[in-house]
């Protein structure tokens, strides 16, 4: 039975989670180092499937390796098959009505508590899992699995509260108009990536917050950190069945979900190719569904920095190094191509070569390493092929890096390529690694670069303009209006903060539903309009019907 709501509640003020800097000698650094040491000593962990609150061990397992030490297993996770996926769907649908009926502020309280558990009790553990399992250094883990995860959970609560207050602005005499924001009919399939622990949590939590039930398939290379999130949700009071944790082979799990009559939505972050294939499968199955599914996806990018002749090279170079090489270039938003005017090229090249040479690459336990390893062997091989292509081409020159070694971990040195043409292979294709390609253009052709940027890739995720000249800033902002969903002025193209810069792009980069904003939550509700009349009518005819 639903609980009567006897007051209109209001959330506490929501602020971005403060980030620890893990400076030498700090207690935070000591705690994180201890968490890393403990986790390494206890690994490998066993990760079950979780359906209806029950931990299921199938005996069929896969290993999540540590990218910086590919002989070390962080966890062995049990994998689901189509039958278990069907069980997860059935259990989610069985939990749906009670979850949907739970008073809104009780749902909010669960996710607000989850955020506090991440912030305090489990901060170091989930950061350590992200470092060991996904190859992030301490700072990159902190801004992801601690700060951004907390921000997603808390700001979504605030956005949901704001969303529910949106009501019709007008009522006729004797009429009360109102709308309610119903959960979708059916279940949401969340398919999450390896590169952000926080995104995994958000893909499951955002639709669940709005009263939906979720089948969550985590990426194999992020299973352990995502499993910790699932356990945090449970500790925070999330009822069994609301989020079903179903690791395993994508074709079997996703295939079973997309073929189900009650499939209501796909919440996806991953590659453009996979997203397109899933959308195509939804189209093929459209006749099976109870309702038209909501498809929400954030996918690939070929993100750019456009440098104007008025830019300050001492700003351009450090911003570009961070954008290209943080987390080994494995952010959806990472810098992958630069357009540099010829009048600045000599100075930028000198600075860039000198600074990139200072980047340390190595194990996550050494906090002085700016970069660690790429995620797995497949990624390593793909990136290495792009580097080898540039090495063998007469149309390109490698001025930094260009070496790689997977004998211990999947290590690739930060690599800078200079291409003779803006349509060179590494200027146009997504690499998803620590490789940035530069095209040096005649400074008089600045505005011509707008079309080049837009026409040479299918993506439109992030981009930046660097210029002191305000006319150039304005011109580029207008000329590149559709080239990036997140556009930066004199700042790097990475680092969107929840509650400050809603994130997402269009074209081949996704549906641009803007994670970290109220826009995303609208995708997981179905609006019902209610009109209530208080006055009776005197008859059925209208004045125009009378003589």
Short names for language-model regions:
Residues 1-74:
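Hydrophobic face of amphipathic alpha-helices that form TPR/SEL1-like repeat modules
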Residues 2-12, 17, 21, 68-80, ...:
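Conserved C-terminal structural/oligomerization subdomain of aldehyde/semialdehyde dehydrogenase
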Residues 71, 107, 130, 211, ...:
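Residue-level signal for inorganic ion chemistry
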Residues 82-93, 97-98, 108-124, 134-165, ...:
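Long amphipathic alpha-helix in the N-terminal Rossmann-like dinucleotide-binding domain
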Residues 91-98, 113-117, 121, 129, ...:
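Generic, well-ordered alpha-helical scaffold segments in large soluble proteins
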Residues 131, 150, 158-315, 512:
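Rossmann-like NAD(P) dinucleotide-binding subdomain of oxidoreductase/dehydrogenase enzymes
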Residues 159, 191, 249, 269, ...:
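Conserved residues at the C-terminal ends of beta-strands
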Residues 232-237, 259-261, 265, 273-422, ...:
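ALDH superfamily catalytic-core signature
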